[in-house]
Amino acid sequence: MVSCQGTRPCIVNLLTMPSEDKLGEEISTRVINEYSKLKSACRPIIRPSGIREWTILAGVAAINRDGGANKIEILSIATGVKALPDSELQRSEGKILHDCHAEILALRGANTVLLNRIQNYNPSSGDKFIQHNDEIPARFNLKENWELALYISRLPCGDASMSFLNDNCKNDDFIKIEDSDEFQYVDRSVKTILRGRLNFNRRNVVRTKPGRYDSNITLSKSCSDKLLMKQRSSVLNCLNYELFEKPVFLKYIVIPNLEDETKHHLEQSFHTRLPNLDNEIKFLNCLKPFYDDKLDEEDVPGLMCSVKLFMDDFSTEEAILNGVRNGFYTKSSKPLRKHCQSQVSRFAQWELFKKIRPEYEGISYLEFKSRQKKRSQLIIAIKNILSPDGWIPTRTDDVK
């Protein structure tokens, strides 16, 4: 039995649910409960004009297969619907968050949590989630009894949500676009990468983040594409990839109100675009709605993004505006302010990594990344499959 009305709590009878649906419900409840504790600066507002803002919520959870009172542990939660223009990266030096969509921020947050746990790892007492091997320097593994899940309050942008968009838009919402219409492409010579939601009838192509056609282009790829790539390469970023003995993958993605047809399109997008995928994601439904999602046509996307990280014995949260900590943004014609970077930024993660592996002090982030030949070859191979016409990268963003 489910009772959901507007923004009121949703009462769900977990006892009558299949086990996987029950797991999806439990994960969503934990993530939303943590969201409700965020400071008001980290959440959407009612603007002075009376217009209501909305946002997307995501969270990374660790599930203990052995069960127990702490079966589900939240690693990170994040909100956000924004991606910055590619041009912003020319002054970034790793300090600006280019992609502030919730699920990408949540995964960045989980990587920061893992880096923090490795930095504070004590071999004598160990760690709840990770264990080290006997190598020197030691490398780590996620303990076998833990699995990772990603909760997202709505379908990820890009290919995985195109069928839903097609089924739910009005006939006059979008102009009809033919494959020969060149304005839909970021680069007319690369017809396997489309801009945003243009030509939404077309499937199995890479898309940039959605945005107004007259806005400065972001070049950041859709969440569907990024999540799919991580399911072949690992949810670990290049820094944790170096520190872990084996890659780590998502076991579940939890999305509210997943009807059978929508779930089928999700599985088609995630399971067939990359052949022979050994680590297929299971998509779990949940009934509990996210109360700060879009509820009315007049609601507008929230300007603020946020991230909250759950470390070993404390949590920390940040409000993020225009890719930097709230209150630190400067116009693109000016240099960035000191300490503007988020704790999940490339700059902050690189600084943390060098404390763990001081032998990398003195080289840049991109130089370090270029040395990961096996990982680089894998990612290139994935890109070649997803976009046979070629890849359009974002601007270089290095940290010295």
From Swiss-Prot:
Occurrences of domain A to I editase (ranges): 76-400
Ligand binding (Zn(2+)): 101, 157, 223
Swiss-Prot/TrEMBL keywords: Hydrolase, Metal-binding, tRNA processing, Zinc
One Pfam family this sequence matches: A_deamin
Swiss-Prot/TrEMBL GO biological process terms: tRNA modification; tRNA wobble adenosine to inosine editing
One GO MF term: tRNA-specific adenosine deaminase activity
Catalytic activity, EC: 3.5.4.34
Cellular-component GO terms for this entry: cytoplasm; nucleus
Enzyme class, broadest EC rank: hydrolase
Family: Belongs to the ADAT1 family.
Protein name (database record): tRNA-specific adenosine deaminase 1
Organism of origin: Saccharomyces cerevisiae (strain ATCC 204508 / S288c) (Baker's yeast)
